[in-house]
Amino acid sequence: MKNFNGKLILIGLMGAGKTTLGRQMAQRLDYRFYDSDHEIAAAAGVPIPTIFEMEGEQGFRSRETAILKKLVILPHIVLSTGGGAVLKEENRALIRKSGTVVYLHAPPETLLERTRCDNSRPLLQVADPLAKLRELYAARDPVYRQTADFTVESANCRETVQTLLKRLSR
């Protein structure tokens, strides 16, 4: 694994725990925490579902790339990326060269359990959210694994934080 340069970038599907674990890691490392989805919504002045509604997924992805470019140049950060950030090669290259990339992995059933009551996830506003998560998982899991420096199972938050801290200190 490449040396940890003070930038931890978390990737994975929605519900994998990127934001929750990211906040915990930032606190433990005494770093600043950023959630790219939050930053996109703040910059746009509207929630993510509204961006999807007004601009479609492609418009959202363009905003995502612009925000990632601004965030990855900051020192000592933990960055939680949106689940689809890795869909664009430009984003994958950007995060790979900018920091240590960790794929937080969880199976679709766990992801559904974690996102079931969250209406702010535009891609899950479908008749069968589990089928949609399985479809996203099948398409994205290989990309996450190729992009990440390493993969961590996203289960118990405390244990996952400890695992990440150990991996970063190697």
UniProtKB/Swiss-Prot annotation:
User: Which cofactor(s) does the record list?
Assistant: Mg(2+)
Q: What Gene3D superfamilies does the entry give?
A: P-loop containing nucleotide triphosphate hydrolases (3.40.50.300)
Q: Which InterPro entries match?
A: P-loop_NTPase, Shikimate/glucono_kinase, Shikimate_kinase/TSH1, Shikimate_kinase_CS
GO cellular component terms?
Answer: cytosol
Q: Which GO terms describe its molecular function?
A: ATP binding; magnesium ion binding; shikimate kinase activity
Catalytic activity, EC: 2.7.1.71
List, alphabetically, the HAMAP family matched: Shikimate_kinase (MF_00109)
Q: What is this protein called?
A: Putative shikimate kinase
What species is given as this protein's source? Neisseria meningitidis serogroup B (strain ATCC BAA-335 / MC58)
Gene symbol here is aroK
